[in-house]
Amino acid sequence: MSLQTIGIAAVAVVYFLIRYFNRTDIPKIKGLPEVPGVPIFGNLIQLGDQHATVAQKWAKKFGPVFQVRMGNKRVVFANTFDSVRQLWIKDQSALISRPTFHTFHSVVSSSQGFTIGTSPWDESCKRRRKAAATALNRPATQSYMPIIDLESMSSIRELLRDSANGTMDINPTAYFQRFALNTSLTLNYGIRIEGNVNDELLREIVDVERGVSNFRSTSNQWQDYIPLLRIFPKMNREAEEFRVRRDKYLTYLLDVLKDRIAKGTDKPCITGNILKDPEAKLNDAEIKSICLTMVSAGLDTVPGNLIMGIAYLASEDGQRIQKRAHDEIMKVYPDGDAWEKCLLEEKVPYVTALVKETLRFWTVIPICLPRENTKDIVWNGAVIPKGTTFFMNAYAADYDETHFTNPHAFEPERYLTASSDGSGTPHYGYGAGSRMCAGSHLANRELFTAYVRLITAFTMHPAKRAEDRPILDAIECNAIPTALTTEPKPFKVGFKPRDPVLVRKWIAESEERTKHLN
């Protein structure tokens, strides 16, 4: 065989290999702007490790909705408030499913199954989501306020102790990770972690769930988009290690609950109610999925928002917000009973606005969990075929200058007026549409209660050392840019009790009210 023939054959092989590895799951969508990429990788290299800000910049050139190639997957990005509202809310019946990804769905989730939020839409997902939504709706949430009473009190009690009555600056992260996680564990299993913020089980769950969150991220695993990379064992080894560690504590928590049910010592909880209901229509795999969802969701939204909300309140600009919030709380509760009344009602509009602005400004899930359309969707005349993956750029939408006035400023006041800022859908901090966060009512009450109690108990101020102060930027504050959710970089805050005697009195009252939960 001549060298020329060998050369032609080699070129042909390379050509067909490139064509094979360069193909996409969905052909190019006609009529929809496309960001130019490179063979095989598509736009992965250009997107880098900050997909939200890169896509936000592209939107200025290619329009609010465009298509990209991420390896062999074609993805449609929506980057403005109105484009998300059109696709995620007005077209929500079509945009109801989720795509599957190799690392999270085939490796990490091979033993426990998928969370509700990461499951493709089918009858099983419908049953699981209905069960979770019923357990987390507004009336049900009110019945959980004793749990929030206990967990918020526990965090504030330890902040008071560990800050030596406000004389030492302190990192609030672990306190409010436990606040959110214990709330979820008590709701789902009737179990709480009773140790301090350094408890071994608490740290293990937080560490593993943060790791698993990275595998759920749309930007962290190139092997999800380039199948050839899956042949390298290191790509799967870390995911498998996290799966084993997660299996251990999920099995432990469920076994403890089942043992308590058998002994008649269990406390009312979501999974316990299902296990004891002879008419429950959920099988073992579906029950595991609900458990998985409650554990992971407890750390997804509330801790990052609350921790960074505290960071802003403690900043120099945050002093004005603290003062107004405290003044507004005192107007409604001049007798100093806000600590207890915030469990029963939500009657301080400024604090409600503060919660909304926290969720918008920090947008702790910058690129929401992806969606997949179950039928064709039309956008500006372009037909986006069934089975296409969609990414909501929640960060870009929540910072959309055509919708929000001065979006880069932290201004709770924007939600006190009937302007475009304050009316309709307030933000995309919980996603949107048919698969938005089912626990949003619970999360709102957690944030509202924590804010009322923190602001009435303490004045929060900048750390004494400049190097301990937080980064007050929603993207730059993230220690892991490719993670699904914001992992705040370490920082410290000063917590000075307004009236130590009164704060201890409130703590003692909460301890008495919630002693049955311990």
UniProtKB/Swiss-Prot annotation:
Q: What is the name of the protein in this document?
A: Phenylacetate 2-hydroxylase
* UniProt note: phenotype after gene disruption: Increases penicillin production, probably by relieving the competition for the precursor phenylacetate by the catabolic homogentisate pathway and the penicillin biosynthetic pathway.
Which InterPro entries does the annotation name? Answer: Cyt_P450, Cyt_P450_E_grp-I, Cyt_P450_sf, Cytochrome_P450_fung
- The answer on whether this UniProt entry bears the keyword NAD reads yes
The UniProt induction remark is: Induced by phenylacetate.
For this protein, the Enzyme Commission number is 1.14.14.54
Q: Name one GO biological process term.
A: penicillin biosynthetic process
Which keywords does this Swiss-Prot/TrEMBL entry list?
Heme, Iron, Metal-binding, Monooxygenase, NAD, Oxidoreductase
Q: What family does this belong to? A: Belongs to the cytochrome P450 family.
Pathway(s) of this molecule: Aromatic compound metabolism; phenylacetate degradation
Species of origin reads Emericella nidulans (Aspergillus nidulans)
State if Metal-binding is listed as a keyword.
yes
Q: Which gene encodes it?
A: phacA
Which top-level group of life is the source organism from?
Eukaryota
Task: Show the CDD domains listed in the entry.
Answer: CYP_PhacA-like (cd11066)
Any matching Pfam family: p450
Q: Which GO terms describe its molecular function?
A: heme binding; iron ion binding; phenylacetate 2-hydroxylase activity
Catalytic activity entry: 2-phenylacetate + reduced [NADPH--hemoprotein reductase] + O2 = (2-hydroxyphenyl)acetate + oxidized [NADPH--hemoprotein reductase] + H2O + H(+)
Described function: Catalyzes the hydroxylation of phenylacetate to 2-hydroxyphenylacetate in the homogentisate pathway. The homogentisate pathway is used to catabolize phenylacetate and use it as a carbon source. Can also catalyze the hydroxylation of 3-hydroxyphenylacetate to 2,5-dihydroxyphenylacetate (homogentisate) at low efficiency.
Ligand binding (heme): C437
